[in-house]
């Protein structure tokens, strides 16, 4: 299955970040399209306070200690590879699409320290933390082929332990692209995702404190093809006081982040503000799944 250039760029969570694509290409007055949330509060997990908070949240939800330690080793590898002034010192507030770094310069810094190894993206990171809350039937065999996962799989060949104990078969079952109807109706695409995951034997273990948040994109590589793919994904954690924390890897060569939100509406506004950046297209808008249901 061949993907068009736009799909490939988005599907990688881009080496330079989907956030870069989301921030360009608009001109004129699009104020009516702006999300309700225009500021975010986030940390790059480069300080002891936010790291301890995340460790506690993950442990409280039942994420195994081995997965937590594996995650933080890769956070440290990334943070140690880039300039410290590009990272937050604890939680900081910023405009929705603002970054403290130039993504091209950050990519150069990463490459200087890590060579051709691309690093870890949103999909690898989410699976590494969420894997114990996901089940895939033993006979699920997905051949990713020329799928959106080709750079992911190159990274996993170099570091197969990056999935935290999950298998490559599980990774493919969750993230491989799906054939879809040629429609802009979100309801029908949600049904496609649910049915395809079911056919692959993908099920989610119910836990209100930890959820997988997946942003699906619709693309038409050719006139005859229509597909859905995971353009971004992260892990949502709920603290005892109800505060929401969203853990993500922005892109292969962009930072880890933990964002703090008051409710799911704010989280949805954040994700759609970054990724729902097209207009007048003949494809469906991105949509957000919470585990295997459309996020409210």
Annotate each predicted stretch with a short phrase.
Residues 14-15:
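Core hydrophobic alpha-helical transmembrane segments of single-pass membrane proteins
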Residues 24-296:
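Cysteine-nucleophile amide-bond enzymes
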Residues 1-11:
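Bacterial N-terminal signal peptides that target proteins for export
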